[in-house]
Structures are given as structure tokens and as C-alpha cells.
From Swiss-Prot:
A Gene Ontology biological process term: translation
Keyword terms, alphabetized: Ribonucleoprotein, Ribosomal protein
Ribosomal protein in keyword set: yes
Protein family (similarity comment): Belongs to the universal ribosomal protein uS2 family.
SUPFAM superfamilies associated with the record: Ribosomal protein S2
Protein name per its UniProtKB record: Small ribosomal subunit protein uS2
Listed GO MF terms: structural constituent of ribosome
Length: 225
């Protein structure tokens, strides 16, 4: 376990609090709390932008910002509901983060969307003269910083952008933020798996509590030996 992961560990009291709403009612998360925590979706950075402050649960003595799992879960639900309204093949998921290559590819496969991993081809959204020009209806981005080219192009042509964002994120040109650890390998796998499953639930392609055949591990980028 890394030092950052140790800093992000929660006490039993904190875990109990995160399973209740602000009014004290017990809430049901999309996956068990411990599943979220073990994947590290809540682990932020040692900096926090003004916009992201509202998603922070705690600031550790070491200066690590810890995200509120309840808000991550809530935002995943809202994003899935929004994305379910689009024609599947018009949803484009993008990432330039290597740890997100597999999650994004599997996500697009499960929801029957499209994916661009690695370097985003400049002008692909804004220049109709390019042979590889595409016209998606919505973009799902992994990181507002590293996927800025795609996000800026989408903004220019009026394509809405849903993006995962850590505590240090600048969210210009992003229409809807899902606060989360968008740098960790296991975190990215779980986030994209949950989002994919919830989109299928919202489309009613699977029951409200139905499962998909793919496992979270199938969404995880493998480390090179």
C-alpha cells in the first residue's frame, strides 16, 4: 500500500457516516462502500481547486484531500441517466492516460459507444474536411487536464462533456463533473465499470439491479511484467 493510500484510509466512524445521507438516512450505494474504498476512488491529491471543494469529505493532517464517496456515487448515477439518453454509437469516450486505456475501451464496448485512447487527433471534432472527422453527441473524458484537446474541441462545436475530475482539476469547458480519483489503475477500472453498468440499467437493457457479464477486473489495465 502506498503512502497516499494509507493517508486515504478511513476510520470505522467515517465509514459509518459515509453510508448515511446528510440527514442521517441510510443510503444504498451502487457498489458496497468497501469496494469503492479498496479501489481508492476517494483518494484525491494534495491540492484542491475552488470548484472541487464541494466534493471533499476530509482534509488529512498530511494535506491529502479525500473525496466524499456519497457524492461520487450520486454523480455516477446522474451521469448514467444523462448518457443513457443518447444513441449509443454517438457517445465518445476519450483518454490519454495509459491506466485508462483498458477501462475506456471496455466502457465503449459495453455501452456500444466509441473510444479514442492515446493522443487525440487535433481537429477530429472541429474540421469537417478531415477524413477522420466525427460528430459524436456527447463526450466522456477521463481527465480535464490530459484530455483538454478533446474537451476544447467539443466545447467549440457545442458537444456536452462529462468528465471525471480529481481535487486538483480545472473544469473549464466541462459540463458535468464526476469527482473521483482519475489517476489510479483500480479506481479507473471500477469507475468506468460502474458507469457502464448503470447506463445499461438506465436504458432498461438490464434490470434496475441487474449485472453485466464483464467483471471489474476486465476493465483494469494490466501492468507490464
Amino acid at each position: 500500500m502506498s503512502e497516499k493510500e494509507k493517508e486515504g484510509q478511513l476510520s470505522e466512524e467515517e465509514k459509518a457516516e459515509l453510508q448515511k445521507s446528510e440527514k442521517g438516512a441510510v443510503i444504498e450505494l451502487l457498489v458496497p462502500l468497501d469496494t469503492y474504498l479498496s479501489a481508492g476512488v476517494h483518494i484525491g491529491t494534495h491540492t484542491c481547486t475552488k470548484y472541487m471543494e464541494k466534493f471533499v469529505y476530509r482534509v488529512r493532517p498530511e494535506g491529502l484531500y479525500v473525496l466524499d464517496v456519497r457524492k461520487i456515487d450520486e454523480r455516477l448515477r446522474i451521469a448514467a441517466r444523462f448518457l443513457s439518453r443518447f444513441t449509443p454509437e454517438n457517445i465518445l469516450a476519450v483518454t490519454s492516460r495509459p491506466y485508462a486505456f483498458t477501462p475506456v475501451t471496455k466502457f465503449a464496448e459495453v455501452i456500444r459507444g466509441r473510444a479514442i485512447v492515446g493522443r487525440f487527433p487535433p481537429g477530429i471534432l472541429t474540421n469537417p474536411q478531415l477524413p477522420n472527422h466525427i460528430e459524436p453527441e456527447v463526450i466522456v473524458a477521463t481527465d480535464p487536464r490530459t484530455d483538454l484537446q478533446a474537451i476544447k474541441e467539443a466545447s467549440k462545436v457545442g458537444i456536452p462533456v462529462v468528465a471525471f475530475a480529481d481535487t486538483d482539476a480545472k473544469v473549464d469547458f466541462v459540463d458535468f463533473i464526476i469527482p473521483a480519483n482519475n489517476k489510479g489503475r483500480k479506481s479507473l477500472a471500477l469507475l468506468y465499470w460502474v458507469l457502464a453498468r448503470q447506463i445499461l440499467r438506465e436504458r432498461r437493457e438490464i434490470p434496475p439491479e441487474g449485472e453485466i457479464p464483464q467483471r471489474v477486473e476486465d476493465f483494469e489495465t494490466r501492468l507490464v511484467e
